[in-house]
Amino acid sequence: KGEANGFFTALGVPTTFLQTTFYYEAFLQGQGPRRDDNGELVLSLPMADNKLALVAGEDIGKTALGVFRRGDDFIGKTVSIAGTHATGEQLAAMFTAALGEKVVYRPMTTDQMRASGQPGAVEVANMFQFYSDASEYFTGVRNLDLVRELNPELQPLDTWLTQHKDEIPLD
C-alpha cells in the first residue's frame, strides 16, 4: 500500500489516502472471545495493555463517501479512520455488555500468536505487533471526531457488538 501511495504522489495524481485498521468483522471470524477449558469466555489478543483502533467494514465506504463529498478539502492528505479506540480490558467489557456474560481479557504475545498454527497467524501477529509497537501513533492519527464528521453514521464497537452478538462464534 505504501509503495502504491508513492506512485500516486510522484505522478502528481490528486489523491486522498484512506488508512483503515482492524475490522470489527474479525470478531465474527475467530478473533473474538472463546471459551477456555473451564467454560470462561476469554478474549486473547497480542496487544498487551495498548489501545487498538477498530472500525466496521461498512464504515470505511461511508467515510470515503464523506471525503468525496468534501471535494478538494482532503487532496494530498491522509485520512486515518477508526470507530473505536480500546484496550483489551475495554474490549472485554464491551463484549461482556453485549453478550450478557463475563468476558475476561488475557493478553498473549505476538510470538504466541505466530506459533498458534491458526491460518494466517503469522500475518495477524505481524499486524498486531505493528499496532502494539506504534499504538500511541496508530490511535493518535485516527481522529474519531473527524471520522464522525465525515460519516455521521459511524458505529462505535459497543453498538456494533450488540447488533452482531448472535453471529460471534464463542466455541
Language-model features, listed with the residues they occupy:
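NAD(P)-dinucleotide binding in Rossmann-like oxidoreductases
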Residues: 106-108
